[in-house]
């Protein structure tokens, strides 16, 4: 099936069942730091950078980005090429999906090759053209694509990995490192392998995709030393005249995101990865998003450090010194001040120890870091016999000798979480089937075994997760644990009594049987975030779930099929406490969703409660949002003479109104009062909304 999508009507025509308003609520954050292919197309130049596409228009200087929250069908672009005959950019994705993008933003999705069931490797290596037809060189042969409508015309299984193709003198040539050069007359049956003639030799394709001349405009397009797009003209003497200093869309330095943090109105992320099964070896990166621009921390070199600078795994912020940040990594503990590198703590200059027998500094595993309120930094130094350590605010180190952490084994300890209710630091051991949950009283150096490797649920059934990933707390004092067996939690009673008791929340089937199912049982759950409405955002290996406050209702299940989520493998989710944004760190990058919940206020006043948009103009048909409310506030919207037009309860500190009355009809022009009552019964008018029709 082919879907034609224009920028103007994209929110109406879909590949999926995305709602108009829901689509608007997504943002995809793509990196554009590494330009790999440049495709001039007249006055517009398309660029592939860090597996994402952007364009630059020479007539007005407009920079346009393209992503899955906009017109694109997928993420992870591997190749682009401009089809002159059809005036479309062929966009090939790493999963073999294909988009055809025009200069004005129209997109034809051609998913047939991507959807084709086959045991063959469908990797596309190169794109070549013969009129309106694109020949896609694949790992098994050649695919012929009509670039006018996205139809797959033919598939030629040559039984070899084709590096590139070209048409010459009535023949289609396929160059293969394995079998040499293959050719077939275009007038012959190319589906018949016997018509393909093998020639000796293989010619390596020599093309510089980042230094390209546009045959039409005679302009040269290239990238600057710092990775930006630029173009220039050559005069008769070969002198270059540059037309721009360099173009690069706003974006993070890479698409590597693993853990997310909110601090002082900014979003921070570390981009490393490590587990017993996955050794990321990803560059040491800290991304910073201030809501408008991206920046990143200084990256020390291996020469500076004497070891690799890879796989940043966690971070925390000094409560006593603004801008002072500590980052835990696979290769030690990194100190930064205002984004500048200060020092790396490793086995040479601290009690941190290497996890390997040869004492390699590349594996001084700092897998959890957390400041306590007094400014002491607690560090989990994984895969050694004394993994819990503390760097005092005076600069002195201490090693905590807790018998539960030293007996008979080493530990893959991670995810330090400071509970606001209990004052303990919670962390997990995720050492395959030997998982453990710990609560540490850091004030008195007491470690409590909170369960594992087996746990007992409320029905006295035994649970033995293969992994534990993450710990957090909800607004009712429940300690939630993300595990390979699904989400588990300890009630305040479970926390007090210990003994490995957990709750697997039971969701009623509501089918008259009084039966219930465990919430996301055996769904690999990697992270749980609690928003202002006490709802649970659950990151899994099959997308993101939003679960209601009482955990009985699945409000959303976002996947790559029904949302702009870049990947169904979601490592982390962050509900920003300073806004209604929810951020998702996935296997293929970062995105965010504008939810309908914000952090509630303890007290509602006319100074901290407001509505937007306000006034509501005639052309606006979306939701009107009231923010600054208290938790679970009873909200009524009334006319100036007291007639009720809408009512409900806040989600966290927010309430959404569609601008309609109780009968579903848009309200008349006028001033509407927002009356709110807290759970204890205190009430009053907290703000006013002007509606203009």
Where are these predicted regions, by residue range?
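Glycine-centered tight-turn motifs at strand-turn-strand junctions
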Residues: 644-667, 678-682
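Short, glycine-anchored, charge-dense loop/turn motifs used at functional sites
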Residues: 634-645, 664, 672
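Terminal processing/anchoring signals of secreted or surface-associated proteins
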Residues: 19, 597-602, 611-614, 642, ...
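Glycine-centered coil/turn sites that cap beta-strands in beta-rich domains
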Residues: 603-636, 654-657
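C-terminal tail/sorting-segment detector
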Residues: 673-693
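Short, conserved beta-strand segments of beta-strand-rich sandwich/propeller modules, principally
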Residues: 581, 668-673
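Carboxylate-rich, polar loop motifs that coordinate divalent cations or form catalytic acidic clusters
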Residues: 20-609, 644
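Bacterial Sec-dependent N-terminal signal peptides
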Residues: 1-24, 171, 376-378, 693
């Amino acid at each position: 099936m082919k879907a034609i999508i224009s920028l103007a009507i994209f929110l109406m025509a879909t590949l999926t069942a995305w709602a108009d308003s829901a689509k608007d609520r997504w943002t995809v954050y793509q990196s554009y730091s590494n330009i790999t292919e440049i495709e001039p197309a007249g006055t517009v130049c398309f660029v592939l950078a860090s597996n994402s596409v952007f364009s630059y228009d020479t007539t007005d200087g407009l920079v346009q980005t393209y992503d899955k929250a906009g017109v694109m069908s997928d993420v992870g672009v591997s190749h682009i090429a401009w089809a002159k005959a059809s005036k479309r950019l062929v966009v090939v994705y790493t999963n073999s999906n294909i988009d055809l993008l025009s200069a004005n933003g129209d997109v034809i999705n051609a998913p047939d090759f991507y959807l084709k069931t086959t045991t063959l490797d469908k990797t596309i290596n190169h794109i070549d053209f013969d009129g309106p037809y694109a020949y896609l060189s694949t790992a098994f042969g050649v695919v012929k694509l009509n670039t006018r409508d996205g139809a797959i015309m033919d598939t030629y299984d040559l039984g070899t990995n084709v590096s590139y193709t070209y048409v010459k003198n009535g023949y289609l040539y396929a160059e293969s490192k394995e079998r040499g050069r293959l050719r077939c007359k275009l007038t012959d049956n190319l589906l018949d392998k016997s018509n393909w003639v093998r020639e000796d030799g293989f010619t390596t394709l020599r093309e510089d995709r980042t230094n390209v001349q546009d045959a039409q405009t005679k302009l040269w397009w290239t990238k600057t030393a710092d990775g930006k797009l630029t173009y220039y003209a050559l005069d008769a003497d070969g002198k270059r005249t540059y037309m721009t200093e360099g173009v690069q869309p706003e974006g993070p330095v890479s698409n590597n995101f693993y853990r997310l943090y909110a601090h002082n109105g900014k979003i921070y992320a570390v981009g490393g990865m490590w587990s017993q099964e996955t050794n990321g070896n990803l560059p040491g990166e800290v991304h910073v998003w201030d809501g408008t621009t991206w920046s990143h921390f200084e990256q020390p070199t291996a020469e500076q450090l004497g070891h690799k600078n890879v796989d940043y795994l966690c971070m925390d912020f000094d409560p006593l010194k603004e801008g002072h940040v500590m980052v835990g990594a696979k290769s030690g503990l990194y100190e930064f001040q205002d984004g500048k590198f200060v020092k790396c703590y490793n086995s040479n200059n601290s009690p941190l120890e290497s996890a390997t027998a040869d004492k390699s500094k590349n594996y001084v595993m700092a897998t959890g870091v957390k400041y306590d309120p007094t400014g002491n930094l607690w560090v989990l130094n994984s895969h050694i016999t004394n993994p819990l350590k503390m760097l005092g605010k005076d600069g002195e180190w201490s090693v905590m000798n807790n018998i539960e952490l030293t007996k008979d084994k080493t530990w893959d300890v991670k995810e330090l979480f400071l509970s606001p209710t209990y004052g303990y630091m919670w962390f997990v051991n995720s050492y395959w089937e030997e998982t453990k949950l710990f609560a540490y009283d850091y004030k008195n150096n007491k470690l409590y075994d909170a369960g594992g490797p087996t746990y007992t649920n409320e029905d006295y059934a035994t649970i033995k997760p293969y992994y534990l990933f993450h710990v957090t707390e909800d607004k009712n004092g429940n300690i939630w644990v993300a595990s390979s067996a699904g989400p588990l939690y300890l009630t305040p009673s479970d926390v007090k009594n210990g003994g490995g008791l957990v709750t697997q929340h039971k969701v009623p089937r509501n089918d008259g049987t009084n039966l219930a199912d465990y919430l996301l049982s055996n769904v690999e759950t990697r992270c749980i975030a609690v928003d202002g409405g006490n709802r649970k955002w659950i990151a899994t290996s099959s997308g993101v779930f939003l679960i209601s406050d009482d955990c009985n209702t699945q409000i959303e299940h976002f996947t790559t099929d029904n949302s702009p989520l870049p990947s169904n493998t979601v490592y982390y989710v962050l509900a920003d406490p300073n806004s209604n944004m929810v951020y998702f760190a996935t296997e293929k990058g970062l995105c965010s969703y504008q939810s309908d919940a914000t952090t509630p206020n303890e007290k509602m006043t006319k100074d901290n409660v407001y509505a937007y948009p306000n006034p509501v103009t005639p052309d606006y048909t979306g939701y009107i949002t009231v923010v600054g409310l208290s938790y679970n506030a009873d909200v009524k919207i009334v006319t100036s003479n007291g007639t009720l037009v809408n009512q409900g309860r806040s989600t966290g500190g927010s309430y959404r109104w569609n601008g309609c009355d109780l009968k579903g009809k848009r309200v008349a022009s006028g001033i509407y009062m927002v009356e709110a009552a807290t759970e204890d019964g205190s009430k009053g008018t907290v703000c006013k909304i002007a509606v203009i029709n």
